[in-house]
Regions:
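Short inter-helical turns and helix N-cap capping residues of alpha-solenoid HEAT/ARM repeat scaffolds
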Residues: 26-27, 64-65, 103-104, 134-135
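Short, mixed-charge aromatic SLiMs
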Residues: 31, 100-101
Length: 137
């Protein structure tokens, strides 16, 4: 777990594939930190952000551990600015889906926070519409 966390401190090193692999197969405590470290590694540009986001999107959807899904949502929000279309739109749609449908309230809250922090007018409008329709409070 400490290794997965500390790898995020070296985003220029060749750490992307080991972090992706950890997020796929390791224990929950390691996956949790691998998600956060992938955000740091991916923030160095689109070439690293895109594969990091691809794995984070998968983990957001299928990981059995709520804390890993929550960290994946946070990490996707952090990577958003480094991504290009259509990946940015996929991140928004996945976070919206998670915010509305995840069975854990903490994961839903983290997805909403990630969306709000994107500071994208069209995303904020969608959130406001969901509030007005009574789907969000």
């Amino acid at each position: 777990k400490a290794v997965a966390w500390s790898l995020g401190n070296y985003p220029e090193a060749p750490i992307l594939n080991p972090l992706i692999r950890s997020l796929q197969v390791d224990i929950a405590a390691v996956r949790l930190w691998a998600a956060s470290s992938l955000a740091e590694a991916g923030c160095t540009g689109p070439a690293k952000a895109d594969p990091a986001a691809a794995q984070l999107l998968l983990s957001l959807r299928i990981d059995s551990e709520p804390a890993v899904r929550s960290n994946s949502a946070w990490a996707l929000g952090r990577l958003y600015g480094e991504l290009v279309e259509p990946r940015q739109q996929l991140v928004v749609e996945s976070l919206l889906h998670t915010m509305l449908n995840d069975f854990e309230s903490g994961v839903r809250d983290e997805a909403r926070l990630a969306l709000e922090q994107l500071e994208q007018p069209e995303v904020l409008e969608r959130l406001q519409t969901l509030v007005e329709e009574g789907l969000l409070s």
